[in-house]
């Protein structure tokens, strides 16, 4: 049976090959956080923020992966489906590893959001979501390898698929509708 390399593991391998010890989850959280806060999708701003987390300017192969990650996030946030897929270890990994990565993702999201939000006013719902993410970032040690732990993790994951979308819709201008061609 061939070994399946998850996107998370592939990205971790790429980052490690460049000497970066950062988690793919934290990097993805950073990108999604800054995007949800209204930073837009230009590559240079993303590279600048990623470089701080990576502690160095990314090499070309990592830059290309960062561009791909940003294009994926842009498609998720602005597409018709508005579905967010978190870059986390697969369900076959131990719960402790998945919970730790989820905590890292939340930390990255909060950092990215904080970098990009500027002086925008946060509504009650946005504050609640950010407080929830801060609490989830601390949950990594609370989940144990049990059926209850798995259930708790899955409930948190369901929330995590929606939370970024709530913030994105609050802090980003909706795309202008495309004019429909008229027949004359």
Swiss-Prot record:
Top-rank taxon, per record: Bacteria
Pfam families reported in the protein's UniProt record: UPF0149
Classification via Gene3D superfamilies: YgfB uncharacterised protein family UPF0149, PF03695 (1.20.120.740)
GO cellular component: cytosol
Xref: NCBIfam families: PRK02166.1
PANTHER family: UPF0149 PROTEIN YGFB
Similarity field: Belongs to the UPF0149 family.
Record protein name field: UPF0149 protein PSPPH_0305
Natural source organism: Pseudomonas savastanoi pv. phaseolicola (strain 1448A / Race 6) (Pseudomonas syringae pv. phaseolicola (strain 1448A / Race 6))
């Amino acid at each position: 049976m061939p070994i399946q390399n998850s996107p998370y593991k592939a990205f971790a391998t790429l980052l490690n090959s460049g000497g970066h010890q950062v988690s793919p989850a934290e990097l993805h959280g950073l990108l999604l956080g800054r995007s949800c806060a209204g930073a837009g999708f230009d590559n240079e701003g993303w590279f600048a923020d990623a470089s701080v987390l990576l502690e160095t300017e990314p090499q070309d192969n990592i830059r290309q992966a960062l561009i791909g990650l940003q294009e994926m996030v842009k498609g998720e946030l602005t597409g018709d489906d508005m579905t967010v897929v978190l870059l986390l270890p697969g369900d076959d990994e131990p719960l402790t590893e998945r919970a730790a990565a989820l905590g890292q993702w939340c930390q990255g999201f909060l950092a990215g959001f904080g970098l990009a939000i500027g002086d925008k006013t946060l509504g009650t719902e946005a504050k609640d979501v950010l407080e929830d993410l801060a609490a989830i970032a601390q949950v990594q040690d609370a989940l144990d390898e049990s059926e209850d732990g798995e259930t708790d993790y899955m409930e948190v994951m369901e929330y995590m698929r929606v939370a970024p979308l709530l913030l994105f819709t609050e802090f980003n201008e909706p795309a202008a509708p495309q004019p429909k061609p008229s027949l004359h």
